[in-house]
Each structure stands twice: as structure tokens, then as C-alpha cells.
Design a protein with these regions (language model features):
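PLP-dependent amino-acid enzyme catalytic core
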Residues: 1-184
Length: 184
């Protein structure tokens, strides 16, 4: 695969715009603004966005839009059974899963064991303290969780407007069925 051939990529100056590339996040910020202006009549209304998320990429763009001043009340993070992010927002514990612990689900785009964009939010949460983020991620890179539950940082999370939840396969199917029956 070309994306894994580093010599070829360097020789031909090829890059990717995947979910961890800052250019993609910046591009996604735009549609939070577009969505806001499409959903509101005045510029002082607050909105909330619900975002299915495994890698924290799209919702990170929402976080950036909010930091830029877009009046977002809540960013609702929805995960599947691989609930690493939901666990963090509920408990303050970030515990990436091993490959063996990561479940294969009916929503495979969220079958993520370690959210590669999450570090960006933690950087903001720590008041952009690069040393603290480096220490936290050193633990993660060694396969250990980090726990912010007993710290002022955990209480500060609510200031960013995040709400989270997870679903399982039967709940997703029931929701799809209900929406189809009621709105088709």
C-alpha cells in the first residue's frame, strides 16, 4: 500500500489527510460553522452536536470550533461497545484497550482502542501544558491508563460542554428501526 511506502511517499511528496492530520480537523471545523448557521436564526443561539466518535477526530473539530467562539452548548460524544472515550468522560480514567480487548462491532468505524486525536483535547484541558500531556501519554504508550478523576482537571471537563454515551448492537438496531418506522 502506498501509504506505508515511506520512501515512495517522500520521493513523490505524497501525504495523507486521514483523521489524525491537522488539515482534516481544520476542514471539519468549517462544517460545524455551516451546521450552526443552517440551524439558527440569530448569532447568539446555542446549539448541540451529537457525533459518533471512536478516534475523536470529528468531535475534536467541534471542540476547536467551540474554542473559536462558536456557541456550542454540548458536544455529545457517542461511542459503541469500544467505550474508551465514554469511560473517560464519565470517570476521568483514560484506559486504551489492547487489540485483543477491542471488540468487532456493527459500527466498525468506532472500533477504536486508542483515540489518536484525544491528545489534542487533553492538551487544551491541561491549559496547553505540553510537559503534563507528555507525561500522561508516556503512561499510555507503556500500556497504562491515566486517571484524572481526583484532580481539578476532571471537574474542568464540564466547562468544555462534552457529554458522552455508548450504545450496543441491539440498541442501535432498535433506534434505526424506530427512526425508519416513524419518519420513512
Amino acid at each position: 500500500v502506498v501509504s506505508n511506502d515511506h520512501a515512495f511517499k517522500q520521493a513523490h511528496r505524497i501525504g495523507t489527510v486521514n483523521s489524525i492530520n491537522w488539515a482534516r480537523i481544520v476542514a471539519q471545523v468549517v462544517y460545524y460553522f455551516k451546521g450552526y448557521f443552517a440551524a439558527t436564526k440569530t448569532n447568539n443561539e446555542q446549539v448541540s452536536f451529537a457525533v459518533p466518535s471512536g478516534n475523536f477526530g470529528n468531535i475534536c473539530a467541534g471542540h476547536v470550533a467551540r474554542m473559536m467562539g462558536l456557541p456550542i452548548k454540548h458536544l455529545i460524544l457517542a461511542t459503541n461497545e469500544n467505550d474508551v472515550l465514554d469511560e473517560f468522560f464519565r470517570t476521568g480514567v483514560y484506559r486504551p484497550r489492547t487489540t485483543v480487548e477491542t471488540k468487532h462491532t456493527s459500527s466498525p468505524s468506532m472500533d477504536i482502542s486508542k483515540a489518536s486525536n484525544f491528545e489534542r483535547f487533553i492538551f487544551d484541558l491541561t491549559d496547553r501544558n505540553a510537559n503534563q500531556v507528555t507525561e500522561l501519554w508516556a503512561e499510555v504508550d507503556q500500556g497504562n491508563p491515566f486517571d484524572l478523576s481526583g484532580t481539578p482537571l476532571f471537574a474542568k471537563i464540564q466547562d468544555y460542554g462534552f457529554i458522552s454515551g455508548s450504545s450496543n448492537h441491539p440498541a442501535r438496531i432498535a433506534t434505526i428501526r424506530e427512526i425508519y418506522q416513524n419518519y420513512h
